[in-house]
Each structure stands twice: as C-alpha cells, then as structure tokens.
A protein has these predicted regions:
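Family-specific signature for flavin-dependent thymidylate synthase
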Residues: 1-190
Length: 190
C-alpha cells in the first residue's frame, strides 16, 4: 500500500515576495523569516539549522495568486516557488509514472535495489537479479514537488485507472493552502 509523508513545505514567503514584482508593487502580506545556523560546541556532532517563516497572507495577495493559478501555468509562475518534500513508499511502477513530471519535481534519493534487494551480487548475477525485479516492488523515495507541478498532476491524474494516483491526490489535499492554490478552479471531480 502506498504511503506518503510530508517532510517539509517551504517557499510561501518567497512566492509572495515575487507575486507583485512584474508590476513593481510591494507585497501586501506580512512575513517574518528566520534563518539561523549554529553549532553548540566544537565537540558537538550536531549543527542546528533553524529556518522558517511566519506569513500573514493578505486576502488580496491570495486572490491574485488564485487568479494567476486559474489562468494556467504561464501565469502561475509564482506557485513554482512553493515546494513540498515528501517520503513516498510506493511500487516501482508508480514511481516510474511520477517521473513523467520532470519540471517542478526532483527525486532527491531512493532506496537502492543494488544495495538492498541485490546485496552481494555482481556481474551477470546482479544484472539478472535487477532485471527480474517485479514492478510491484515497494520502494521508498524522497521527492520534491512544486505546487504548480502538484496542480498539473491533479488535473492529469484525477481520473486515472490506477488507485495509487487517487491516494497521491488525497495526500495533495492535506497540504497547506491546497484548496486555495492547487485545487482552486478545478471541478469537484478532482
């Protein structure tokens, strides 16, 4: 069974800052950002990275973003800046279909079939084992998606025959501002 876990959502402050630039206007929303990095001591093995933004979205900014999203990708460039990182545990066949989305999606890493299912094999034995892996083999990946790409996936896959796509779209619905910036203007069927 497919499982998707949101790791992080970021970029709203940057997207809002860019929103009104084409017309030389200032952002109306209020943003408070924090970026700090420190290490407690020389022997401390951990670095602390604190990165965050508190955003109070002005209703007119949100309405403008929705208007641009509804007009299409060429107008909705601003939502490319809002990104989500997720752990996806899914069959290889779904992961291959997700790879259709080359822009606004990046696979940061995936479990290695060579280091896990085919551990200790080499040469012809390794090639044979990898070529015989079933497409239904479950694999864990970490992927990054822009909100613009997630909207495209929702539009293109909402009526797909594979039930895994419906689970994926259900996950998209859980994201912050998904109704406002991903699903806005779409039919209730999506």
């Amino acid at each position: 069974m497919i499982k998707i876990e949101t790791i992080e959502v970021a970029g709203l402050a940057g997207a809002l800052t860019a929103l009104r630039l084409p017309y030389g206007k200032e952002v109306r929303s209020k943003m408070y950002t924090t970026i700090k990095h420190w290490q407690e001591g020389i022997d401390d093995p951990y670095h602390v990275w604190k990165n965050g933004a508190e955003v109070e979205i002005n209703n007119r900014d949100l309405a403008l973003m929705q208007t641009l999203v509804k007009r299409g990708d060429e107008h909705a460039k601003v939502v490319r800046g809002i990104n989500v990182w997720a752990k996806i545990y899914a069959p290889i066949f779904l992961l291959r279909e997700i790879e259709t989305y080359r822009f606004g999606r990046e696979r940061l890493a995936s479990e290695s079939t060579m280091h896990q299912q085919c551990r200790g094999l080499s040469g012809d034995e390794l090639v044979k084992a990898k070529s015989e892996l079933p497409m239904g083999t479950m694999q864990l990946t970490v992927d990054m998606f822009s909100y613009q790409t997630l909207r495209r996936i929702v539009i293109q896959r909402s009526n797909h025959r594979l039930p895994e796509w419906h689970t994926f779209i259900d996950w998209v619905r859980t994201l912050p501002l998904a109704d406002e910036l991903i699903f806005c203007g779409l039919n209730e069927d999506n």
